[in-house]
Amino acid sequence: NNLNNKGRILNKIVECYTTTDGIYSNKYHKVLAQMNVTTIWTTNYDTLLEESFRHVSTVIRRCDTDLLPIVDIDQKVEIIKMHGSVDSPSPENLVITKEDYEDYFYTHPLTTERLKNDLLNKSFLFIGYSYRDSNIRSIMTQIRQLCSRGTRTHYMVVEKEKNVNSYKLQKLWAKDLERFGIKTYIYENADQSHRELLEIMESIAQKSKGNTLFVTGSHTVEESAFLEELGVELARIKNLTLINGQSKGVANIVLKSFIDECLNLGQSVQNRIEIYANPCAHNEDWETKEEYGALLESFKYRLVRQTQIMIVLPGSYGTKAEIEKAKQLGTIIIPIITEDRNELIDELLENINIVERLKIFSPSLYHSLKNEQLTTVAEVIECVKNILAV
């Protein structure tokens, strides 16, 4: 009888999630895809996360046996669907009924062990759950069992209960979670917009990339007083990490002066720079060859996903591709107006979202860009410092 009941529920779930009417990824999925994370655990059955990460290399774990193969997941995002997926070859394995939840640790030993390992070694951010949610109870059980072994600090963001008594219970639940290393933030949602949740997620997405900055532009530039000064001033920003993916040109000039200034300051260069091997370093023609498209896409994604701030100078095909990837991943873009500005910079200046985003960080840079005046190093540094200070 239980099997028959599960079969009916299963058919309804599959029918619901396999129709295309009204089920689309939303702004929250988009922000998740912008985060610099390696693993996402979800109890949802749908494929909206996969859709949101379609521009990203992913490894999907739909069931226990998916965790068996040792797969090279370097630079990929792992999505673990601990309760199964509607697109699984064996949808009957979806965790649906009360019995499924109660027997989960026995029927999914590999997933359970992986969950234990991640809870011990990674910090989790729980989103979309409430204290009454059965989906979260099994995970809380694991954390309680592991807390004596010193788990990492975990975080939970939940919507405030509207009922007074429910809110009291919610606060007690949140207080209890502190004993197990889980810090809970309860946000107001009176207008049902979940605006604060989105703001929290956007802030996390930005900060997940670290205090990182990437300078992109033409490979043909050989010298520039502006870039040399920029490299020196960037090196003087404490805890800033400079990302480099060019062997010559704009980024390399900045890198050289950045390293020189770090050495002058007696700082370890190893802790201040991250260098990514560029497959086009010795043959720039590869940028335009279709057969190398997947390789270049992977390279640019790995580089930009680590970048919080991108400074853009005039460039060509490669620079444009990096800008497009930065837009997808929510990177803060700072266009630079120089005497040799080209249409690539003009396109950025015409992008209201990019320019307006800089207004709160540096009014002087914002007004210079709006008035199409030459950018100064001082304006750029002010903007970068204020972004990192948020």
Label the predicted regions.
Residues G210-H219:
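Short, hydrophobic/glycine-enriched beta-strand segments
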Residues V221-I387:
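Acidic/glycine-enriched connector segments
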Residues N44, K98-K162, L242-Q246, T307-E324, ...:
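Glycine-rich anion-binding loop/nest that anchors nucleotide
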Residues K27-N36, V56-V59, L67-K76, P89, ...:
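SIR2/sirtuin-family catalytic core signature
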Residues I79-T111, E290-F299:
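Glycine-rich phosphate- or other oxyanion-binding loops that anchor nucleotides, phosphorylated ligands
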Residues N1-E15, L67-I73, E261, L265:
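A phosphate-binding glycine/aspartate-rich beta-alpha loop in the early core of alpha/beta enzymes
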Residues E15-G22, E99-T107, T220, W286-Y292, ...:
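Short, flexible loop segments at the rims of nucleotide/cofactor-binding pockets, characterized by
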Residues N1-Q34, T38-W41, D46-S57, K116, ...:
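Gly/serine-rich nucleotide phosphate-binding loop at the start of the catalytic core
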